[in-house]
Amino acid sequence: MDKRDLEQLLSNVADGSVAPADALTRIQTAPTADLGFAQLDLSRGVRQGAGEVIYGAGKTAEQIAAIIEALRDAGQEHVLVTRLDADKAARTAELLAGNIDLGYVPNAQLALVGGMPSPTGNGRIVVACAGTSDLPVAEEAALTAEFYGNEVDRLYDVGVAGLHRLLAHAEELAQAQVVIAIAGMEGALASVIGGLVSCPVIAVPTSVGYGASFGGVAALLAMLNSCASGVSVVNIDNGFGAAYQASLINHLSAGAPCAR
């Protein structure tokens, strides 16, 4: 159960569609569920505002399906699965068929249960990537941000090799609440954007590039050493982590505790 699930449950109690005793039973669900191969954190959504996310790499389709079912049984209506390849997604969907609908986005390797919510953020998140080869990471970031209730503008293939492509979107950048800047090779895009905007920039180095890019390490070090003051950096290819952080920022209220 996450914050939006809890709000909906309380709303249902208020309008009489759910009995208070039934609501209490759902809220008092044990904070963990032991599946043998996984210990699910069922209270994370109440503590942090967003429920547990499933990292699909390294898990079997059977394990992923079992986790999804357990999360749903505990009241978490929306579930996100990252790093899920197409074959495993198809098998997971078969296991859930007739019970839970699994939406899959191949180019982002993301699976969604419960669909996309209406936007609730303070402003817009811009996801900008340097090249078409960065699109899988960019789409992971963009879809994750939308999953957490944010409006997203996509600026793709706007790398520094053709700076005019980025500058053509100066208005969108100026209106952003947060920018996620994604680039491989030398990773210069984040610093350039950081020098153009007044909002936080979250840089994502990607593993795109030739030999001396060292699988994204060159871009990572360049972004960490950015001279633009508002740039922070997440791990290589971590579009999900960047989007989660951007969503937290976009849902902050002045003087309010951090909550989504």
Predicted regions and their residues:
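Long amphipathic alpha-helical segments
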Residues: 1-85, 89-95
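Short glycine/serine/threonine-rich phosphate/pyrophosphate-binding segments
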Residues: 62-64, 134-139, 163-164, 183-192, ...
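Short, acidic/small-residue loops that bind anionic groups at enzyme active sites
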Residues: 101-105, 193-216
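Glycine-rich phosphate/diphosphate-binding loop of Rossmann-like nucleotide-binding domains
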Residues: 121-164
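Glycine-rich phosphate-binding loop
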Residues: 168-206
